[in-house]
UniProtKB/Swiss-Prot annotation:
This is Large ribosomal subunit protein uL10. GO terms for biological process: translation. PROSITE patterns: RIBOSOMAL_L10 (PS01109). Forms part of the ribosomal stalk, playing a central role in the interaction of the ribosome with GTP-bound translation factors. Keywords: Ribonucleoprotein, Ribosomal protein, RNA-binding, rRNA-binding. Part of the ribosomal stalk of the 50S ribosomal subunit. The N-terminus interacts with L11 and the large rRNA to form the base of the stalk. The C-terminus forms an elongated spine to which L12 dimers bind in a sequential fashion forming a multimeric L10(L12)X complex. It comes from the Bacteria. One of its GO terms (cellular component) is large ribosomal subunit. It comes from Hamiltonella defensa subsp. Acyrthosiphon pisum (strain 5AT). SUPFAM superfamilies: Ribosomal protein L10-like (SSF160369).
Amino acid sequence: MPLNLQDKKAIVDEVKEIAKGALSAVVADTRGVTVAKMTGLRKAAREAGVYMRVVRNTLMRRVVFSTDFECLQDTFVGPTLIAFSTEHPGAAARLFKEFAKLNKEFEIKAAAFEGTLIPVSDIDRLATLPTYEEAIARLMATLKEASVGKLVRTLAALKAKREAI
């Protein structure tokens, strides 16, 4: 059943609003993936703070027009699933990458981050971005290592100074 104009406008407005607040987007082809697997993916997406939607390609072109994701327009060919990361830039890429490992039919087409098109070959860079908590933990570990190293150097300097006396 075809959508009427008001329904199309409502879909475009809803998805465009999400796109404006999103940090990154990933586009995939879902041909051959079962409904049960897609339902599992949707559930995982909700838990990860990822907005997923299957939208007609013509409507998706309208959605991404004049947004950071305009570079994705050429990827809207065939059945298209788009996911917007709203909390962490790598969330959708990580989710799709893990799902693609388990489902060979699932094909990631491309991603966009900060207005830049990221080809499939470089999706790993986006997927492996640390979360906020991971980044803070790494920073704290680095600072802790620096403090220990500084203490060791100070003690070595004191020892050398005492030996010189």
